[in-house]
């Protein structure tokens, strides 16, 4: 069948193979070819390279170049039982997939990210009704938003390293967590006490995190390196657009039925996404595809000596090493690396400001302009316009600043900071504009949203690219720490946001001084890209984490 051959390693095709309805003839032929290759020396020296859980698919985490290591590596490569790609044009290698298949995979990972990510803010239109039904205050009800955000900051600490192992891969994590995410939406829709709702929202946040944590990894699995920044930017734009579209959908559900239908909608969106991914989303993680090939070769030949290099390395990692790499190292790097600490703080404050808007919007658009729930949802469309413009600006800056430096050999990681330096002023501008023009006309706060996304989107892209380039060996730890800091601030800001605006409000300017407070904070933090552009090279030379 064309479907089973094109979409191998999907959940449906895997199930059909397990039930014996279809068979993998290509793998069987490969197994027979491998059986004809006999090892020249069965007593070869075993190579045991140093292992790091965060080692990428094409990067060795051990930098030793001794003769014994080189000899062991050469023997390992000549081992006839070591499963690898069948040459550079192997059709199972995700980098060699047809463009249509790659495009469908990118679309699906964007859809998965949007559906799960919108779960954070889709709740906000129903918050007042939840307060009334459960007889709780604003802060307690806001925990349903805050703990969801905290959950998807905690999840990547465990899920990201697991997704890089040969045994688990990305697909299994996506599908298992999405299934339980869907189930927990049923719980949220039927719960009858605020404590149960808060707990299920927190768990839902953890379950939604794999798409946020490893979606970029999926893109990198299938897209050629020169195109990765642009495709990642498109995926990131979708991730930003999702939580600002969600309040409109949530408002429509509350307006049509009640707050519980918000979670029924999220459940049905999750179910539709689950079905689509089950049929058309294949495994993209290179190590897992090779691991599957090795398992089939063992089964078809009856020879258990077939193995993959990454699975062999994974087995050498004990629980203590795994916990150190996933829990301790991100915190240690934040404390010891000034560049990481500075950008984690900058990104965290910017992300917290984003979720602060969910507290400010009702004050402005309901309190001043008397918008309905749906109209307030439409007021978030300024963020969506900003996403489109921000992605276009990112592409222009990338082509004008980054690409020429790659081509003429003058590229350094600090080149990415030029992008952040160009747009960092937009962040405080957006906050001042939102706060001080709230009573002039409703369109001006909406315009401020555009400036906000122009800044935040490009600062995020520049920061992540800079940190990944500076710390390639420990990029998973860097991003795990950044994600946790980001989610912690985004969790906290909505909890004190309403009190901050109420206490700093004046009669004519209800959100001006509150917005200005965080605006001045972001204005002070805007100096970070400039400082690191100047002192970044010297900081890298003194860092033990950037040594090759």
From Swiss-Prot:
Q: Does the keyword Kinase apply?
A: no
CDD domains in the record, alphabetically? Answer: MFS_Tpo1_MDR_like
Where mainly found?
A: membrane
Localization annotation: Membrane
Q: Which UniProt keywords apply?
A: Membrane, Transmembrane, Transmembrane helix, Transport
Give start-end positions of Low complexity composition bias. Answer: 60-73
GO biological process: one example:
xenobiotic detoxification by transmembrane export across the plasma membrane
Any Gene Ontology CC annotation: nucleus
Protein's membrane topology: Multi-pass membrane protein
- Gene Ontology molecular function, alphabetical: fluconazole transmembrane transporter activity; xenobiotic transmembrane transporter activity
Q: Determine if Magnesium is one of this entry's keywords.
A: no
Task: Kindly give the Gene3D superfamilies that the UniProt entry links to this protein.
Answer: MFS general substrate transporter like domains
Q: Where is the composition biased (Basic and acidic residues)?
A: 31-51
Which chain regions cross the lipid bilayer?
104-124, 139-159, 179-199, 203-223, 230-250, 261-281, 347-367, 376-396, 416-436, 440-460, 476-496, 511-531
Which residue ranges are recorded for the region named Disordered?
Answer: 30-94
Q: Which PANTHER family match?
A: FLUCONAZOLE RESISTANCE PROTEIN 1, MAJOR FACILITATOR SUPERFAMILY
Q: Which family does it belong to?
A: Belongs to the major facilitator superfamily.
Function, as annotated, reads: Probable efflux transporter. Confers resistance to the azole derivative fluconazole (FCZ).
Name of the protein described by the UniProt record: Fluconazole resistance protein 1
Protein source organism: Saccharomyces cerevisiae (strain ATCC 204508 / S288c)
| Name of the gene | FLR1
């Amino acid at each position: 069948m064309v479907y089973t051959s094109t979409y191998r390693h999907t959940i449906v095709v895997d199930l059909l193979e397990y039930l014996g309805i279809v068979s993998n003839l290509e793998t069987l032929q490969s197994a027979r070819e491998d059986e004809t290759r006999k090892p020249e020396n069965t007593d070869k020296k075993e190579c045991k390279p140093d292992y790091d859980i965060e080692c990428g698919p094409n990067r060795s985490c051990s930098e030793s170049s001794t003769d014994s290591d080189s000899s062991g590596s050469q023997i390992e490569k000549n081992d006839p039982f070591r499963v690898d790609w069948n040459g550079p044009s192997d059709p199972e290698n995700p980098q060699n997939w047809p463009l249509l298949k790659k495009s469908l995979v990118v679309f699906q990972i964007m859809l998965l990210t949007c559906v799960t990510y919108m779960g954070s803010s889709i709740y906000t239109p129903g918050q007042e009704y939840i307060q009334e039904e459960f007889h709780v205050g604003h802060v307690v009800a806001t925990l349903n938003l805050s703990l969801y955000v905290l959950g998807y900051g905690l999840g990547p600490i465990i899920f990201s390293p697991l997704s890089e192992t040969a045994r688990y891969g990305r697909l299994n994590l996506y599908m298992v967590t999405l299934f339980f995410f869907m189930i927990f939406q049923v719980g949220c829709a039927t719960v009858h006490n605020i404590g149960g709702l808060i707990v299920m929202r927190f768990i839902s946040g953890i379950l939604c995190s794999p798409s946020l944590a490893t979606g970029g990894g999926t893109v990198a699995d299938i897209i050629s390196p020169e195109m990765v920044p642009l495709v990642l930017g498109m995926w990131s734009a979708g991730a930003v657009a999702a939580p600002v579209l969600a309040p409109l959908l949530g408002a429509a559900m509350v307006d049509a039925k009640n707050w519980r239908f918000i979670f029924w909608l999220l459940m049905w969106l999750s179910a539709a996404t689950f079905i689509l991914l089950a049929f058309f989303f294949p495994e993209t993680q290179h190590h897992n595809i090779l691991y599957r090939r090795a398992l089939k070769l063992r089964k078809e030949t009856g020879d258990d000596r077939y193995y993959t290099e990454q699975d062999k390395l994974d087995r050498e990692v004990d629980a203590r090493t795994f916990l150190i790499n996933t829990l301790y190292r991100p915190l240690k790097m934040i404390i010891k690396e000034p560049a990481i600490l500075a950008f984690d703080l900058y990104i965290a404050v910017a992300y917290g400001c984003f979720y602060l808007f969910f507290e400010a919007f009702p004050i402005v658009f309901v309190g001043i302009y008397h918008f309905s729930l749906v109209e307030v949802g439409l007021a978030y469309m300024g963020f969506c316009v900003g996403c489109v413009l921000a992605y276009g600006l990112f592409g222009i800056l990338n082509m004008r600043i980054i690409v020429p430096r790659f081509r003429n050999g003058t590229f350094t990681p600090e080149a990415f900071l030029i992008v952040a330096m160009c747009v960092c002023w937009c962040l405080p501008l957006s906050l001042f504009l939102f706060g001080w023009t709230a009573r002039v006309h409703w369109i001006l706060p909406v315009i401020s949203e555009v400036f906000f996304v122009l800044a935040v989107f490009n600062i995020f892209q520049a920061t992540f690219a800079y940190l990944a380039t500076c710390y390639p060996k420990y990029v998973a730890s860097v991003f795990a720490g950044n994600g946790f800091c980001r989610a912690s601030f985004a969790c906290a800001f909505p909890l004190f946001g309403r009190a901050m605006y109420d206490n700093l409000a004046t009669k004519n300017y209800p959100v001006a001084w509150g917005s200005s407070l965080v605006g001045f904070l972001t204005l002070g933090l805007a100096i970070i890209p400039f400082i690191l552009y100047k002192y970044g090279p010297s900081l890298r030379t003194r860092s033990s984490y950037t040594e090759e």
